[in-house]
């Protein structure tokens, strides 16, 4: 495990190409379990989480080839009903193979998930939904076992909260429940869910409504092989846009779907940044101190929780006081203490952070606590005076492809240093 050494004071200029969406690729890879024929996925980012999912697919009987950004998946052996704990503990999204394995083989046993430490993200919504679809659920010794027990004709599942993971898990599983009609109410509406619907439908599934709060799945008997391209990563795009603005630079962010970031764009413009949308590219310029703004995270189409830490780093040097309210992951403020070590003036009360803008941050040793928090500290290091050393930095490689090269090409001075034994 190494650290990132960031020399502050760089002004980011130039172009950056956005990779495929990790949060779309992972559930689509899990959905490939539904199909015996070869699935070819394009625009797949080369990230640690993707490699973990590849290992999971291989462990349960699939052949997986990954060259550049193209992934080929095909069932090679009988599907194993159990996923090793050492794989599932590495990544929360790996839990979403439980339903697809169970619907294919009648039974699945998967360890309770791991992943980023940003508060409780219970799997109860997943399990209650699977029960309604005819699966028995047993939780013991850190594992969840799902067994298919009864066929259903029709069921409505109302999620207590529009959970992205639960929505993806349940719609994927329901897609292969032949003859069943499953309705998910209060479904998450993220673009990644629309991408998953489009992928499953290309394989022969019958799903409607993704992108709205009501998704209807008509289960089919069999899926077919398909070639499919993953959507661009809206969170990666937002991270580079806010980094360029924070450095008071100018840049062009390419391979973006602007419709996926409308709320975020509005907030950037409120701070004084100038944005110009050019098809699937976004130009941003910011030459002055940002104005303070209030930010409230909400499920899509609200302001993305995955961009809240980066926005906080940006607003830490704004003129005035910003109020950031976190409504998705209530404890997603682990980065606050690290930003304060760099001179930020931030106070937290419950799920609200009060950010009083300071003139400058100063470089300091800090620690990455999760994926997006580490991205926020990288942005803070770029705009700070002096040198910032970010330890526990491996988080960032879970969500940003070629992150050091991309930031360096924009003019950031970043070096990855291996930790000495």
From Swiss-Prot:
Keyword Ligase: no
Segment forming the signal sequence: none
Catalytic activity: phosphoenolpyruvate + UDP-N-acetyl-alpha-D-glucosamine = UDP-N-acetyl-3-O-(1-carboxyvinyl)-alpha-D-glucosamine + phosphate
Residue numbers binding UDP-N-acetyl-alpha-D-glucosamine: 92, 306, 328
Modified residues (2-(S-cysteinyl)pyruvic acid O-phosphothioketal): 116
Listed CDD domains: UdpNAET (cd01555)
Active-site annotation: 116
Residue numbers binding phosphoenolpyruvate: 22-23
A UniProt-annotated Pfam family: EPSP_synthase
Pathway: Cell wall biogenesis; peptidoglycan biosynthesis
Disulphide bridges, residue numbers: none
Keyword Transferase: yes
BP terms from Gene Ontology: cell division; cell wall organization; peptidoglycan biosynthetic process; regulation of cell shape; UDP-N-acetylgalactosamine biosynthetic process
Key words, A-Z: Cell cycle, Cell division, Cell shape, Cell wall biogenesis/degradation, Cytoplasm, Peptidoglycan synthesis, Pyruvate, Transferase
GO cellular component, one term: cytoplasm
Family: Belongs to the EPSP synthase family. MurA subfamily.
HAMAP family the record matches: MurA
Protein name per the record: UDP-N-acetylglucosamine 1-carboxyvinyltransferase
Gene: murA
